[in-house]
Amino acid sequence: MRVALAVALFHAVRGLLPGFWRAAALSATALFVMTRIIGPRPGMLTILLVIVLFDILLSVRTTGRTGMLWLLPPMFALWANWHIQFVYGLFVLGVFACEPLLNSLFRYRPQARNLLPASAAWLTLLASTLATLLNPYGVKIYSTVLLYAGQTRVYNEITELRAMTFRQPQHFLAVLLVLGAAMAMGWRRNARPLWLIFLLAASLLAFRSVREIWFLAIVSVCVVADGWQSPGSDVRGSVPLRSRIMVGVWVLAVVLASCRYYGLSNDALEIQTAGAFPEAAVRFVQQHRLSGPLFNDLSWGGFLLWRLPELPVALDGRTNVYGEDRILRFSDVWKGKPGWNSDPDLARANLIITPRDAAIASLLRFDARFQVAYEDVQAVVFARRR
């Protein structure tokens, strides 16, 4: 998936920016900004399809080949059945469809060849929206979208929903990308209003929740690439054979180095998993056949759901399933706030898996209902006394 993201992003940026190495450098910068959120999760398809969507729309706007737009409805049908953030794609497509209106409001006069045909754009938007209804829930899928949008109180409780901490270089580089995009728009003086809307929306999303930093990175490099392009320049000029060979060598070297560094094997994957999640604690539970109900740390919910499918988790990252009130109550219990010991989920639990440094781990050591069954440097397993 990471290779697919890299190839798709480079192709999209290369369509806007003359100069092979410039496009490669911009793409690499955006990918580095996204490194913290790239992983084996459904959202990776959303990132890939947003890049592909930008590439198709920008290509059609330049070439006038509207036939490519009919790739979008089936893409949205797949997207809606895979990940809820397909609405990002509808937003992108909708802004492109509204570009003539935006140009009129901002009194911007683009070249005719740089506009999507209005009828084709709106027809594609309608067809794509209808295609999203081809899912098991039909139109009700949009109620889930609204539910997620309204769950604002949980942003402080889930790490990836919090704002940037600026304790990682990717966060500072994201700011530089935004500033570079703003500079590129100002440099041209006749920047497209379309990019202003995208940059504002991406900034609001990413600076509110670090999980959306990928959208900011994609939009920013597209704005920079479009601003770098001089009018009438040959964007997709031929790339010298020497440059292609050098890129191939570098890509091969990076792949080999990554395989060596990360150790792409099942054993290495187990080591990485054990470092981030309570793998040893899970194995103890499996070996001793401990029974639930299970009370678990929220951030470990998805992992435990995968590793212990026979034990339903108390909570995981699916905020639409559990609701804000339960998540906030759960957070208070985990922090050991007053009333933690009367929580109904805790009262029903026979098994608790908690980080060793969590407040509740210290409190449970003095709770007569539970005893320590297993402990390591990462996690503590409590079992109900019989």
Positions of PLM-derived features:
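Transmembrane-helix signature of polytopic, membrane-embedded enzymes
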Residues: 4-33, 47
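Membrane-interface alpha helices of multi-pass inner-membrane proteins
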Residues: 30-34, 56, 69-84, 127-132, ...
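Short acidic/glycine- and proline-prone juxtamembrane loop motifs at membrane-interface regions
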Residues: 37-45
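Membrane-interface transmembrane helices that cradle and orient dolichyl/undecaprenyl
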Residues: 53-69, 180-189
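Short hydrophobic alpha-helices at membrane interfaces in multi-pass membrane enzymes
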Residues: 59-77, 119-123, 193-199
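Transmembrane catalytic cores of multi-pass membrane glycosyltransferases
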Residues: 84-189, 217
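Membrane-proximal, lumen/periplasm-facing interface regions of secretory-pathway glyco-
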Residues: 237-288, 301, 308, 317-319, ...
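Short periplasmic/luminal acceptor-recognition loop of GT-C membrane glycosyltransferases, typified by
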Residues: 286-324, 345, 349-356, 382
